[in-house]
A protein has these predicted regions:
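Hydrophobic alpha-helical positions that pack around
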Residues: 66-169
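Short helix/loop capping segments that flank catalytic or ligand/cofactor-binding pockets
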Residues: 13, 37-39, 106, 166-167
Length: 169
């Protein structure tokens, strides 16, 4: 199965199986890569835009009342433009430019930035009508569902002052 690629490895099946699926209003693509030096999601957004959008469509097919929102920090204008073009003809998806600041990509902050709904530490995103997945997870969903390719790899950034040849691998 697919696990979340944001770091915790949470099973995507569980995330996509809320107790009240009809109350899910937002599927938020966490495209806010706010940590210094990290650019893996940025490159994936640029190079695999169609796969990213396709992964969102797969999730939206499970939640007929939901809208898909690609939440991208405003310092990634090229990604914003490319995603806007990719979703221009789809009335259920849009792109939201977020202020570039840390920790914009943290789930609770991201939900608030997109929906203005605050969730406390006892709540899950579904309690606020949201499901949040990151770039790599959405591309993994596309690869698994559309291409039949299992999720067995991910792109990571290796960078910093001590790295001789930084890059995304």
């Amino acid at each position: 199965g697919i696990v979340g690629m944001g770091g915790a490895g949470f099973p995507t099946k569980v995330k996509l199986s809320p107790k009240e699926p009809d109350k899910i209003e937002y599927i938020i693509a966490n495209c806010a890569e706010c940590e210094p030096y990290i650019t893996a999601d940025y490159r994936r957004m640029l190079e695999y835009t169609e796969d990213l959008v396709s992964g969102m469509k797969v999730i939206l097919s499970l939640f007929p009342n939901a809208r898909g929102v690609f939440a991208v920090e405003d310092n990634k204008k090229d990604c914003i433009e490319k995603l806007q073009k990719a979703v221009a003809d789809d009335t259920r998806m849009d792109v939201k430019a977020l202020m570039t600041k840390y920790p914009q990509g943290a789930e609770r902050q991201l939900i608030y930035a997109v929906t203005k709904r605050a969730i406390n530490s006892t709540m899950l995103p579904a309690d606020a009508g949201c499901i949040v997945d990151n770039v790599e997870t959405l591309i993994g969903i596309h690869n698994a569902v559309i291409k039949g390719k299992p999720l067995m790899e991910r792109v990571v950034t290796v960078s910093g002052d001590a790295v001789e040849k930084p890059g995304n691998f």
